[in-house]
Regions:
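N-terminal ordered "arm"
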Residues: 1-27
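A generic short-segment signal for beta-strand/edge and adjacent turn/coil regions
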Residues: 4, 8, 43-46, 102, ...
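A generic structural signal for short, solvent-exposed coil/turn residues
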Residues: 10-12, 48-50, 68
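Domain-exit/linker segments immediately C-terminal to small folded modules
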Residues: 13, 31-33, 73, 87
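A structural-propensity feature for long, helix-poor, extended segments
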Residues: 27-32, 37-63
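Internal, well-folded beta-alpha domain core
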Residues: 51-203
Length: 203
């Protein structure tokens, strides 16, 4: 999600998907998705909920410029593998209730949450540059990183004006497939831009 406040959206509105696979991470009383979590759902003090190996997908529809236009409509998709505590933690994180640099920034832009579903989410990494996400009946997304002058180095956006990975420059990709159909919204962004990277969210 890379934007510039002075450039209007090509089609007059913005619509897309953001997906997260949590390698390792935990939730305490704020957002903390990192690579140092415990292996159980909660730590010895029952104060930290393990979120490792879970997926989250968010659909976003902004009826204008995402930064300066009308507020967004979003829908949240949580990994069905998550237990109730994990679902509650993920909901708080990805709706901005738990804070965190990126989520605090987008919270005022959200006008409506269309729904929160617990669904099977398939996530796959193929080599360095390919990522796939699928939610049966709702989402299909495949992206592939672009090849730069040196094919062994991933091309990236340096210092973007807005990003869902603050402080981390994302790699540039192209969506070979990107379809969505739910909550009365439907689109096909196949062939358009995409981004990916590894990162850490902290409170």
């Amino acid at each position: 999600m890379q934007l510039h406040p002075d450039l209007d959206p090509t089609e007059g509105n913005c619509k897309g998907l953001a997906a997260w696979y949590i390698e390792k991470g935990h939730f305490t009383n704020g957002t903390n998705i990192d690579r140092t979590s415990n292996t159980d759902n909660e730590d010895a003090n029952n104060n930290s909920i393990n979120l490792a190996d879970l997926n989250v997908v968010v659909s976003v529809h902004a009826p204008g410029h995402m930064l300066t236009g009308p507020k967004w409509k979003i829908a949240l998709y949580l990994d069905e593998k998550a237990n109730n505590d994990q679902k509650d933690a993920l909901t708080k994180i990805f709706t901005g209730q738990a804070g965190g640099e990126f989520f605090i920034e987008i919270l005022p832009r959200i006008g409506e949450i269309l729904g929160i579903r617990s669904v099977p989410i398939e996530f796959n990494i193929e080599g360095k540059k390919k990522r796939r996400i699928k939610i049966p009946s709702f989402v299909e997304m495949e992206i592939e990183g672009l090849t730069g002058r040196d094919p062994n180095i991933e091309s990236k956006v340096v210092n973007p004006a807005f990003s869902n990975t603050p402080g981390i420059d994302p790699f540039i990709a192209r969506s070979t497939r990107h379809t969505y159909n739910d909550h009365g919204l439907e689109w096909d962004n196949s062939g358009k831009n995409a981004f990916y990277c590894r990162f850490t969210y902290v409170p």
